[in-house]
Amino acid sequence: MSQDFVEIAKIGATYKLNGELNLYPLANSIETLLSYGDWYIQLPATNVWQQLKGESVLKRADKVYIKLANINNADTAKKYVNALIGVPKRALPQLAEDEVYFKDLIGCSVKNINNDSFGVVVDIIETDANEVLVCKEDNSEYLIPYVKQYIVSEDLNSKKIVVDWEYDY
């Protein structure tokens, strides 16, 4: 399959002897995760996405479990531990002009208005107040609030972000 996929969940440890697995959403909420149509799976150590044949997805309190078709015991289910669940990028909702998917920020190079480099975005921390870009350059890590007052420009096609931020903030 040549289409781009977006990771929406990761499979965790087996949950029951009948082959159920823990499912960890990477989406903002369990409801968002469950709203996507067809899911695809990428097994550990492969780059191949295959359509997922799920038997059921169960939501219990704040946990989600998945039962894959034709997987009826924990031993067989173990090969799916750490697999990724994804959807085709085209399945995601269109964003407004000033919105981005956080996953598109990962890997962007970050420089300030003085052309000082903060490295690349390796993670995004979600806090109650705002999101924070985690940038790494060599052995240094920088935390930059992802708010309009500090973001001068973003070019996601070129994977470049310019910020109004200094090393000593």
Swiss-Prot record:
The keyword Aminoacyl-tRNA synthetase does not apply. Binds ribosomal protein uS19. It comes from the Bacteria. An accessory protein needed during the final step in the assembly of 30S ribosomal subunit, possibly for assembly of the head region. Essential for efficient processing of 16S rRNA. May be needed both before and after RbfA during the maturation of 16S rRNA. It has affinity for free ribosomal 30S subunits but not for 70S ribosomes. GO terms for cellular component: cytoplasm; ribosome. This is Ribosome maturation factor RimM. PANTHER family: RIBOSOME MATURATION FACTOR RIMM. The keyword Methyltransferase does not apply. It comes from Francisella tularensis subsp. tularensis (strain SCHU S4 / Schu 4). Residues 97-169 form the PRC barrel domain. GO terms for biological process: ribosomal small subunit biogenesis; rRNA processing. InterPro entries: PRC_barrel-like_sf, PRC_RimM, RimM, RimM_N, RimM_N_sf, Transl_B-barrel_sf.
